[in-house]
């Protein structure tokens, strides 16, 4: 959900806007034509002023506000082109007065909380207050669904750290971000957002136009392959396809190509990744345990790191240090098992409730690894957990076992 601004429909489905022509945005509704079109936000005339740039269709068309008269915004076309129904609209310089969670969003949420979904995402986040509002709405509906904050507005970038702290995961939504902010800033903003998410141990998704040419072509451009690889090297937890798999002609090929690029890049990164250096700040206990577990795994040449976790927090603390070893996120909670699929380097494993005796729980895990993962005798396994198991979110224990 979130406050996405859109134009309405045209009588003929689309129109061509020519540079220098006047074009009116109106809140009065009705079908549009070559001279006017409706918008879905009644307060927009009060939010904009003469001189503001208005971008349409992911920034491909640009208008400039000339005057505001009642419910109409008069503009002049600066960059023209074809414009079709329901395209997005953005005014980067304006403080848009739409609510962060719309009436439709709340109605959708009533249905979503009854479904077996794992995350809910909020578009056009402006500050941490937007996330708090959605979280309160979830709580009122009896849900603790984690929230993915889509970073695509300049206001969210300005309050990046508080937004990340308030969210459970983040998406670098480069489409609208590249309209709201200068396009030359987007690659650096991507790196900054990913780095901040790593610091906070929050999963981050990089999205939009990663393999855009594969909407119509069976192979990506070289630049797109580099884009995917660089997102992996930046430290993203996940990369996302949109039109490539939703409406493109080669959805399976797009997934296969992206997977191949990820695997090749991860193999390179695993070889080149330096050993973790000490942080220049005080760490929370769970974070310190995660870092220590990764260092211990390197020191004893462990084959795998195991995280015994109820909520998934223990596995996230491990993943933020990007260890060379795979992480097994072992949990008795099926929703945590699903949610951990988003986290870098974690292979989720669902199990029965943990034995309250930690020694017995470790023995069970080692036996599982020996039988199911085919670990050779003498292989080292680093295990992390929060004890007692009933106390969620308390990562405080490391153990090294030998298979």
Positions of predicted regions on the chain:
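Non-catalytic helical/linker scaffolds that mediate oligomerization, partner binding
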Residues: 1-403
